[in-house]
Amino acid sequence: MNKKVIAIVVGVVVVLVAILGVVAWFVPILKVGNIEVTGATRTDPDQVLEVSGIVEGENLFRVDATAAGQNIVELPWVKSVTVNRALPSTITVELTEREPAVFIKRADGDHVIDTEGKEIIIGTPPVGTVEVSGADEGNSEVLPAVIAVINAIKAQDAQMTESIQVVEAPDQFDILLKMNDGREIYWGSSENNHDKAVAMSTVLKREGQRWNISSPSMVTVR
């Protein structure tokens, strides 16, 4: 087969592919028959479908995945989303949800904050979310400091956060953990959080009602 014939064959193939592409775009040969939502733990999948704007039966190739993703990521629990086509008839929607860390009671309800310090919802806090009390609304540094503490505790042992009843934090330098069993652990400032989390895991195994781990190398009890 000489070069001229090869060129003709390639040209024909290119034209056919282009024609098929145009036909697939304007004629709904492949339709959306199924929309799969994964990663929706706290987000209602039906709500995801509704805001996505994608409907079953529409042309698969004309689905605006970018616009759908932009709409979905506006839902409160959604941190990020990926929308893809899966031939012959499926749209996949993969969610990554925000992880709640703390909540704080305000006049308009409980404000649930994620591990990055962003407010998720005003409503019922999920199980395992730690309450923060005493924080000055005008001090923007308190909640990030407390969240850094909670993240360090989770990294050391996630079960330890479940034993915290409330965190009292009038400011970012004066953090006190009140435990479900009545014990108190004074954390102090949001510094050396890893070392303090290690110290916390140790003191929780010992007797004593009031522990001070603000200096993790010199833990005291009274």
Curated annotation (Swiss-Prot):
Membrane-related topology note: Single-pass type II membrane protein
InterPro entries membership: FtsQ (IPR026579), FtsQ_DivIB (IPR050487), POTRA (IPR034746), POTRA_FtsQ_type (IPR013685)
Keyword Lipoprotein on entry: no
Gene assigned in the entry: ftsQ
Free-text function comment from the UniProt entry: Essential cell division protein.
Membrane-spanning ranges: 6-26
GO cellular component: cell division site; plasma membrane
Name the UniProt record assigns to this protein: Cell division protein FtsQ
Protein family according to the UniProt entry: Belongs to the FtsQ/DivIB family. FtsQ subfamily.
One Pfam family recorded for the sequence: POTRA_1
Domain POTRA: 30-98
Cytoplasmic compartment residues: 1-5
Disulfide bonds: none
